[in-house]
Each structure stands twice: as C-alpha cells, then as structure tokens.
C-alpha cells in the first residue's frame, strides 16, 4: 500500500506498528478506526476526544482528501 503524497504528513505505515496497518502518523490508531467511527455516525469532535493521540488536523486532512477523491470520481467541479 502506498500513502498518497497529500497524506504522507498525516499517515504512516510501519511494520513495527499495528502489524503494518495504515495509521495516523505518530500514533497506533489505524485509519480504519476513523472510517468505522464516521460510518457509525460518530462525529469528528467525538473521535478526537476518544483518540487524543490523533489531532483534529490529521483527521480532517484525511476526510478532506477522501471528499476530493469522491468529487473527482463522480466528475464534480473541484475548483471551489
């Protein structure tokens, strides 16, 4: 798995951390935890309270990146 260039500041993959799962940089919190929480209706504020090692900036950067990917995939104008 390769981390997108835009997210290298926020995410990391290290075989020594969480068996090489994609995690928030400097933490042991897998990205999948954020996605699972959002799918369950848990908001960003609650997520960063529950996982204080993940900064709001890290989580928001990933969410924003995902939104851009979706908009691009469905052909929505990215220039806002």
What do these predicted ranges mean?
Residues 1-7, 77-80:
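Intrinsically disordered, low-complexity and often Lys/Arg-enriched segments
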Residues 29-80:
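Long, charge-rich, low-complexity alpha-helical segments
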